[in-house]
């Protein structure tokens, strides 16, 4: 059984993270120092640093040991650090905005992922419209996922 190229890349990225954390000789690329971390699972806000390597969070807590000479440090004193928001059910069509415009307006609110139910476009344009929405979604700065409507037209 062989692994896909994507799987091998993911294994390599994760191994790099382990190496950074365990070696004591490799450092984070970015350190968000002294911010107030919003933990959306425990509903707590607490002071902590956040260390980042590439596109991954390495550690939340005291990250001084992960700070090296090439680490970019941002002073987050008085600021809040939290995960991006996921809008888990929305209709671009109901907002009467294009996906691009909706994206432009929602990014400043911290929305990093949009999950669209395109049943209204499906009602009007069918599969062609849904495919066009998916094509536009591929150019958004946010992660955009288009669900397949269970029933079109909606009843």
Task: Give the ranges of each region predicted by the language model.
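A sequence-composition feature that detects small, non-aromatic residues
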Residues: 28, 48-51, 65, 95, ...
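Short glycine-rich, polar/acidic loop-and-turn segments at beta strand-coil junctions
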Residues: 36, 54-56, 64, 90-92, ...
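Alpha-helix N-cap/helix-start motif
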Residues: 45, 95, 123-126
């Amino acid at each position: 059984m062989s692994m896909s190229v994507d799987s091998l890349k993911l294994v390599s990225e994760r191994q790099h993270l382990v190496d950074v954390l365990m070696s004591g000789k490799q450092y984070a690329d970015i350190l968000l120092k002294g911010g107030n971390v919003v933990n959306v699972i425990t509903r707590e806000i607490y002071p902590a640093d956040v260390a980042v390597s590439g596109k991954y969070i390495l550690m939340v807590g005291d990250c001084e040991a992960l700070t090296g000479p090439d680490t970019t440090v941002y002073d987050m004193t008085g600021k809040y650090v939290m995960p991006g928001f996921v809008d888990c059910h929305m209709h671009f069509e109901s907002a009467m905005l294009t996906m691009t415009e909706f994206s432009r307006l929602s990014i400043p609110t911290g929305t990093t992922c949009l999950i669209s139910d395109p049943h209204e476009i499906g009602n009007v344009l069918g599969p062609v419209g849904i495919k066009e929405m998916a094509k536009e979604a591929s150019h958004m700065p946010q992660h955009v996922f288009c669900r397949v409507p269970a029933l079109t037209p909606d009843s």
